[in-house]
Amino acid sequence: MSRNQQLFDRAQQTIPGGVNSPVRAFRSVGGTPRFITRAEGAYMWDADGQRYIDYIGSWGPMIVGHAHPDVVRAVQETATQSFSFGAPTEAEIDMAEEICKLVPSIEQVRLVSSGTEATMSALRLARGFTGRDLIIKFEGCYHGHADSLLVKAGSGLLTFADTTQNAPSSAGVPADVTRHTMVLEYNNVTQLEEAFARHKGEIAAVIVEPVAGNMNLVRASEAFLTAMRNLCSEHGSVLIFDEVMTGFRVALGGAQAHYGIKPDMTCLGKVIGGGMPAAAFGGRRDIMAKLAPLGGVYQAGTLSGNPLAVAAGLTTLRLIQAPGFYDRLATQTRKLADGLTKAAREAGVPFCADAIGGMFGIYFTNEVPGSFAEVTKADVGRFNRFFHAMLAEGVYLAPSAFEAGFVSAKHDDAIIEATVAAAAKAFKAG
């Protein structure tokens, strides 16, 4: 029995499903999860000593690669001063100033510990600011596991849930909780216009992933985001970009910089923690002024602005500002997508890929999807076989057909070429 299997059997005795986040259990693809012991650069090693090229990157944070010496040094130095204070620090100010500098739509920012906290708090703040209750979200967009957002959500919920009904995607969420959440089709401008026409003066906020990364990778059209911006401005609703995944990943200023569209509020996570638990939400000063202790919208957190997380995140944010960083990252990610597409074509496999910044999506379909409905038409069985063939070749992809992949600054030409060569074998194997 492999060491991975031994650990999985042991884990299931004390941890539900043997994992602390559902997608890690390999339930979608089958087989035994890999228990990781260490990682460096673009590689990680499992409990059986197998090395993998890593295209998960901790689901996005590891943009500069695993165990970057500057990040490690910053965390080590901070740890000697204590792990947490429960009081303000100068480093928190440095972090806030860096975020506001890099994302101009954010005039003020509040640090939290997870993406779910960021989106949940942003929506509460939007409701408090507008005095309205109704929220619009989109099919397949995952905004964390707050009850009001678990309706036709992406990420692990897309893998496990029945998404055919406009009902909570998770057991334990009362329908009453989600009745103030309206779910529309991603990239459907007409639906969005109709929703605002029917609910004038009722919509507190629209929350969207400007590049969806939790139903695989699906880009928002420029027309869709522009209509969203215009409608929110016209009706006094708060436009929230959930950039937990895309922030500092699609571009230095996030997806909003890529599209040139300015939201009222932004949620950040993943990259801003450099691998540590950290997230943030921020935006217009007049909206943020409603947040406690200034205003009546409450939000708090014992470990918000944790010194170790801030040290890792701030160091990462400074590293990614190096000249040419994003040009190189986008080039490598595009090389990967194009190489995989070429290998599939040569093997006669229906397949396509897309890439934006340091994110990519692979689809066992003939065309890149533009909506939740199109994503669900992908050949999941074929993806599962491909996943295991790649794993056997030492390439670690997301263990679900409905998750985006991530490239780091450490994925050089040799690593991309090795990945494409492994894929060529996997495609030919069927």
UniProtKB/Swiss-Prot annotation:
One annotated GO biological process: protoporphyrinogen IX biosynthetic process
Catalytic activity from the UniProt record: (S)-4-amino-5-oxopentanoate = 5-aminolevulinate
Pfam families, per the entry: Aminotran_3 (PF00202)
Keyword Transcription regulation included in the entry's annotation: no
A GO CC term assigned to this protein in UniProt: cytoplasm
Subcellular location: Cytoplasm
First-level EC class: isomerase
Keyword tags: Cytoplasm, Isomerase, Porphyrin biosynthesis, Pyridoxal phosphate
Gene Ontology MF: a single term: transaminase activity
Modified residues (N6-(pyridoxal phosphate)lysine): 270
Pathway, per record: Porphyrin-containing compound metabolism; protoporphyrin-IX biosynthesis; 5-aminolevulinate from L-glutamyl-tRNA(Glu): step 2/2
Cofactor: pyridoxal 5'-phosphate
Entry EC no(s): 5.4.3.8
Quaternary state and interactors: Homodimer.
Homology family: Belongs to the class-III pyridoxal-phosphate-dependent aminotransferase family. HemL subfamily.
PANTHER family (alphabetical): GLUTAMATE-1-SEMIALDEHYDE 2,1-AMINOMUTASE, GLUTAMATE-1-SEMIALDEHYDE 2,1-AMINOMUTASE 1, CHLOROPLASTIC-RELATED
Protein name: Glutamate-1-semialdehyde 2,1-aminomutase
